[in-house]
């Protein structure tokens, strides 16, 4: 649903706006890197749960049991590949020619890779990455963020401490907005609605707005309980492939890629969350990054 990615960017731009942005260091790729057709992001019943499959270029090709007139019709290929028939009329996935990608409509379709190269679209990026399969360069190449490459300044220590303040407030506001729009849209589950209802009806809730970090810090201290569920909820939205209590680089992509051009501390923040440097962020690490106390971290809140 294209409306969701627009909704995400608008909210992020208003609630997470930071002075400058940060350049991303090269990262060792643990899993096949993320990939997204930004304008074609799929969503499930809950629009905040961006389907990570749209960002994952490492999924295996699968073939449906139903036999169609065109064998390629039900043969799925991962991003960067297209289906072709071999001499036996058997479907197979081959690298897509980048020149066959649709012409980009505008700047918003461009993406930046981690080697600081701008591609006309995610289609062009993945098609190029496919041609490098099996090489060291191809293994390390990944989609860094949405939009053309730009200078992203370093994230200062003082700025890093401000990031979770804005992020927490943003997560709370996203949930409240979804709750207000959820009459017949199934944007939230019934269990989620019960949790968010308490936040929505709390008269002490800080309304959405461009607040100074001092106010955000005071609000978190005074209304701490209001932020516990939003932090757990976002973890659950990202922990999808597989649902194992850990966030991989791929699973972080739906949240991370749109934010990097606007929030220059995004990458450094998520790196600091990985306390044991195993390239995965566990629930304890995630919640701790947002200031949630150990006694309040509860896997049963990931609903």
Curated annotation (Swiss-Prot):
Annotated disorder: Osteogenesis imperfecta 17: An autosomal recessive form of osteogenesis imperfecta, a disorder of bone formation characterized by low bone mass, bone fragility and susceptibility to fractures after minimal trauma. Disease severity ranges from very mild forms without fractures to intrauterine fractures and perinatal lethality. Extraskeletal manifestations, which affect a variable number of patients, are dentinogenesis imperfecta, hearing loss, and blue sclerae.
Domain (EF-hand): residue spans on this chain: 261-296
KW Secreted (keyword) present: yes
GO cellular component: basement membrane; cell surface; collagen-containing extracellular matrix; cytoplasm; endocytic vesicle lumen; extracellular region; extracellular space; intracellular membrane-bounded organelle
Result after altering residue 166 to A/L/K: Strongly reduced collagen binding
Gene3D superfamilies linked to this entry: 3.30.60.30, EF-hand
Glycosylation sites: 116
Annotated family: Belongs to the SPARC family.
Name this polypeptide is given: SPARC
Matches recorded under Pfam families: FOLN, Kazal_1, SPARC_Ca_bdg
UniProt xrefs under PANTHER family: SPARC, SPARC OSTEONECTIN
UniProt keywords, alphabetically: Basement membrane, Calcium, Copper, Disease variant, Disulfide bond, Extracellular matrix, Glycoprotein, Metal-binding, Osteogenesis imperfecta, Secreted, Signal
PROSITE patterns, alphabetized: EF_HAND_1, KAZAL_2, OSTEONECTIN_1, OSTEONECTIN_2
MF terms in GO: calcium ion binding; collagen binding; extracellular matrix binding
UniProt main location, coarse: secreted
Native source organism of the sequence: Homo sapiens (Human)
Residues that bind Ca(2+): 274, 276, 278, 280, 285
Cystine pairs: 72-83, 77-93, 95-130, 101-123, 112-149, 155-265, 273-289
Domain (Kazal-like): residue spans on this chain: 89-151
Free-text function comment from the UniProt entry: Appears to regulate cell growth through interactions with the extracellular matrix and cytokines. Binds calcium and copper, several types of collagen, albumin, thrombospondin, PDGF and cell membranes. There are two calcium binding sites; an acidic domain that binds 5 to 8 Ca(2+) with a low affinity and an EF-hand loop that binds a Ca(2+) ion with a high affinity.
Localization (cell): Secreted, Extracellular space, Extracellular matrix, Basement membrane
Domain Follistatin-like: residue ranges: 71-93
BP-aspect Gene Ontology terms: negative regulation of angiogenesis; negative regulation of endothelial cell proliferation; positive regulation of endothelial cell migration; regulation of cell morphogenesis; regulation of synapse organization; semicircular canal morphogenesis
Position of the signal peptide: 1-17
Superkingdom field: Eukaryota
């Amino acid at each position: 649903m294209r409306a969701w990615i627009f909704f995400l960017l608008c909210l992020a731009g208003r609630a997470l706006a930071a002075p400058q942005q940060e350049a991303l260091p090269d990262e060792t790729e643990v899993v096949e890197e993320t990939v997204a057709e930004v304008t074609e992001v799929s969503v499930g019943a809950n629009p905040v749960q961006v389907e990570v499959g749209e960002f994952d270029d490492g999924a295996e090709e699968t073939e449906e049991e139903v036999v169609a007139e065109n064998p390629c019709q039900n043969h799925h290929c991962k991003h960067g590949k297209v289906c072709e028939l071999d001499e036996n009329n058997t479907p197979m996935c081959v690298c897509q020619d980048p020149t066959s990608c649709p012409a980009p409509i505008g700047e918003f379709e461009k993406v930046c890779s981690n080697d600081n190269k701008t591609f006309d679209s995610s289609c062009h990026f993945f098609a190029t990455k496919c041609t490098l399969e099996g090489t060291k360069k191809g293994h390390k190449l990944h989609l860094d963020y949405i939009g053309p490459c730009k200078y992203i300044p370093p994230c200062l220590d003082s700025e890093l401490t401000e990031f979770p303040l804005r992020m927490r407030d943003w997560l709370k506001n996203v949930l409240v907005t979804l709750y207000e729009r959820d009459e017949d849209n199934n944007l939230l589950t019934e269990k989620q609605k019960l949790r968010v209802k308490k936040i929505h009806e709390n008269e002490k809730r800080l309304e959405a707005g461009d607040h100074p970090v001092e106010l955000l810090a005071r609000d978190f201290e005074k209304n701490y309980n209001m932020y516990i569920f939003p932090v757990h909820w976002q973890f659950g939205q990202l922990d999808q492939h597989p649902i194992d209590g850990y966030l991989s680089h791929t699973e972080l992509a739906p949240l991370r890629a749109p934010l990097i051009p606007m929030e220059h501390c995004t990458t450094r923040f998520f790196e600091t969350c990985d306390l044991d440097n195993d390239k995965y962020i566990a629930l304890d690490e995630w919640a701790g990054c947002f200031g949630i106390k150990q006694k309040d971290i509860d896997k049963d809140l990931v609903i």
